[in-house]
Amino acid sequence: MKKYILLAFLLAVLTACSKGFLEEIPNSNILTPEQAEDFQRLLDNSEQVGVTGVLPQLAADEYYISTEKDWLASATATERNSYIWAKDIFGGELEINDWNAPYKSVFYANNIISEVEKQFKTGDLTSALRDIYGQALFHRAKAYFDLVKNFSVPFDALTQYTDIGVPIRKDPSIDYTSQRSSVSDCHDLIFDDLNKALTYLAYDTPLPERNRATKLAAFALLSRIYLYRREYDKAEQYADSLLNRYDKLIDYNKVSQTSNTPFTKTNDELIMYGATGVYRNSGQINSSQTVFVDSTLIKMYAPNDLRLSIYFINNGGKYTVKRGYNGTGLTPFNGFAVDEVLLNKIECLVRRDELSQASLSMERLLLNRYKTGTYNHVAFADQQSALQFVLQERRKELVWRCLRWDDIKRLNKEGKGIVLSRRLGDAVYKLEPNTPGYVFNIPQDEINRSGIIQNIR
C-alpha cells in the first residue's frame, strides 16, 4: 500500500510540474506518503528537491565566449540573452527551470511539512520524523532564498518592506494563486524555517553521503544569507556555529592535478551536496570549447597556486573549468562546503578590523591550496587592503559556484562600483552597478498563468 501512496504522490507532482507551480488547477487532492522512509526517499531525490537556479552563473563575469559566432550558436536564447544582460532573458522560451525547480522543492517540502504536522497532533513523532521535518523546512528555506535573490532586487535593509519579493506558498494544495510578497516577508519566512529546522535536525556533523540537510547545512545557509544581506556580525556568528563543530579542509597537494574530476561529492570539505540546473554554457568541462574562464580571473592565480591546475584545463592559453565539488556531475556546485564558510568568517573578521586573526585564518586555507613550502604568510597591514585580498580569494576559491553574482550585488550596494562588460564583434555590452539588469525576468508563461507582477529590467 505504501508504494501505491508514494506512486500517487509522485504522479501528482509530475502533473503539477507540467502545468506550472503557481497555476490554478481544478483538482489538487493529493495522496501523500505516510511513513518516514517515504518522506526521506522524496527528500533524497536530488533531481527533484534542492536544485537551484543557474542564471547567476550565466550572468556573472567568470567566463567569456570568444566569438560572436560561438555566442550565436549557444543552445538557447536564455544563454545568449543572459550573457549580454538583455532586457528579455528568456526570448520566448517557456518552463524555465530557474523558476520552476525551486518551486518544485517548495511543493515537496510543503506536503511533507503538512503531513508531519498532522502527526504532531497525535504525539507519535519519532526521531526520524523530527529530522525529516527539519530537512523539509531547510529545503523550503533554501528554495525561497534562491527565488528571492534571483527574482527580486538586491537586498536593501531600508527598502525590503516595499521591494517586491516572490509568491509565498506554505499550503500543500496547488489550486490557488499567490501574488508576490514583499522581500521582507520572504526573508522572514526563510529565517523562521531555518530557525525551526535547527530545533529538529538530528545531526551536527556531515553525513557520509553528504546528501541530506543537517544542522551544519543550516548554519552554512544562514551564514550565506546574512553575508548577502550585509549583516556581517550574524554571518560570522553562523560561520562560527559551523566551524566550531566541523572545519576540515582538503590539502590540495593530495588532489590530482590531471584528473577532470578531481573531487568526489563526499569529500571531507563538503557539508552538503547541491547542484543547479544546467545549460551548455554553464556546464563544467564545456565540450564545445566555446566557453572559457575569464582571463582576468586566471591571472589572479600565482604559479604555485594548485587551484589553477585542479580547477581548470589549459587549452593553449584558454582555460575551461573542470568538474568541481559535485564529483562527476556536470552542473555547477551550489551546495555548502567548509571553504566558503571559512571565507565568510575571514571577511567578517576583516570588516570588524580583526586583521591578525583574519590573516591567520586565511593562512590556514591557503596552506592547503599552495604547493607545500611555497606559501608565504600575508600579514594584513590595513583594513582596506585586507578586504581587497579576501575578496580576491573568494573569487579564486569559490569559482563556478553561482556565488560571484550575489557577491557583485552586495558589494555594489556598498559602493564598490563593479561594472560588468562583454565584447562580441564590434559591440560592447555593459551592466552598470545597481541597475535593473541585476533582477532576472519572471518567465512569461508564469505571468500569463498567475497574473503576478513582472520585474522591470
Regions inferred by a protein language model and the residue ranges of each:
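Short, surface-exposed recognition loops and adjoining beta-strand edges that mediate ligand/DNA contacts
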Residues: 28-33, 59-74, 153-162, 203-280, ...
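Extended ligand-binding clefts on enzyme/binding-domain cores
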Residues: 36-40, 46-47, 51, 185, ...
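Sec-dependent bacterial lipoprotein signal peptides
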Residues: 1-16
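Conserved, well-structured interaction surfaces
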Residues: 78-151, 181, 198-202, 329-336, ...
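Membrane-proximal, proline-rich intrinsically disordered regions
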Residues: 17-65, 239, 307, 373, ...
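Inward-facing hydrophobic residues that define packing positions of alpha-helical scaffold repeats
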Residues: 106-109, 187, 194, 239, ...
